[in-house]
A protein has these predicted regions:
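Thiamine diphosphate
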Residues: 1-139
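Acidic, proline/serine/threonine- and glycine-rich low-complexity intrinsically disordered segments
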Residues: 142-143
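Conserved small/polar residues in nucleotide/adenosyl-binding loops
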Residues: 146-153
């Protein structure tokens, strides 16, 4: 059974491999959130790789989209797609580009790019969940590492 430390170490290793293979990217910003993503995806969040659009899943928005390698490595570690795909980061035709794209990668709840836009999107998701009486939590990481909670009735 893997521990949070094991998951975090694998995620960090894959971030370095991806950015090195791509010869571009933001390793510092990605490495800085590896532990947070590990705790969220392997301890806190209700997500399912086999059913990534599950209605009452928790949502995650990476507002600092340039740290996408961390999110990709986490999603692969969680089983959303094969780890072997990680080395296609930023390659022509790859679904793993420099910023997350919710239409191309299972497990991504919001496409992000411009710094800060994800915070307002996460706020809208949380409000929609509250208005619809849904039981999910919305998390976001922005440049200031903001944590946004929707509501919990669990």
């Amino acid at each position: 059974m893997s521990t949070l430390r094991d998951h975090s170490n694998n995620i960090r290793k894959n971030i370095i491999k991806m950015v090195a293979e791509a010869k571009s990217g933001h390793p510092g910003g990605s490495l800085s959130i590896a532990d947070m993503l590990t705790v969220l995806y392997f301890d806190k969040m209700n997500v399912c790789a086999e059913n990534p659009k599950m209605a009452d899943r928790d949502r995650f928005v990476l507002s600092k989209g340039h740290a996408a390698p961390a999110l990709y490595a986490t999603l692969a570690e969680k089983g959303f797609f094969p780890e072997e795909e990680l080395i296609t980061l930023r390659k022509f035709g790859s679904k793993l580009q420099g910023h997350p794209d919710m239409k191309k990668v299972a497990g991504i709840d919001m496409s992000t790019g411009s710094l800060g836009q994800g915070l307002s999107a996460a706020n809208g998701m949380a409000l929609a969940g509250k208005l619809d009486n849904k039981d999910y939590t919305v998390y976001t990481i922005s440049v200031s590492y903001t944590h946004l909670r929707a509501h919990e009735t669990r």
